[in-house]
Amino acid sequence: MNTNLQTATLAGGCFWCLEAVYDEIKGVHSVESGYAGGHMDNPTYRAVCNGDTGHAEVIQVHFDPNVVSYRDLLNVFFAIHDPTTLNRQGADVGTQYRSAIFYHDEAQKKIAEDLIKDLNAQNIWDKPIVTEVAPLDNFYMAEDYHQEYYARNPYQPYCMAVVAPKVSKFRKHFLELLKKQPV
């Protein structure tokens, strides 16, 4: 792996949605779906969905900061999910679907906190941002069938109804960040 890469860990609802969007961002080398922010070691999808672990569904984004900035990644994050709803994204309800930024260093923490302050001041949403900003303790990779889920299952009903609109929104509003033009 490129030693100049940095890592971002984000939670904003179902990890399939975030992974599908971040896979399309230039400067992103890989995206992995997983779990973070909880108290159980090596959680399973079933345990996370039952709400027994404290973990959120997250993605880890490995990116080249010379191509795309951490702030740009966060701008996309705030645009493609609702950061004002506690423990919920659409029909997905539970702490595993919370909005969270798990920072890897103090610089990421500052960028996240400053951006949240800026976005709240702009009154973009009717309610304040509830996104948790916390240090990353551990990241646990999700099961293989969750990796690249949207790319492998674009016609699955959830993907068509929930993931595809987020990908379309990203393509429409962040054209300058696209790796390539959509077909």
PLM region descriptions:
Residues M1-V183:
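Flexible coil/turn and secondary-structure edge motifs
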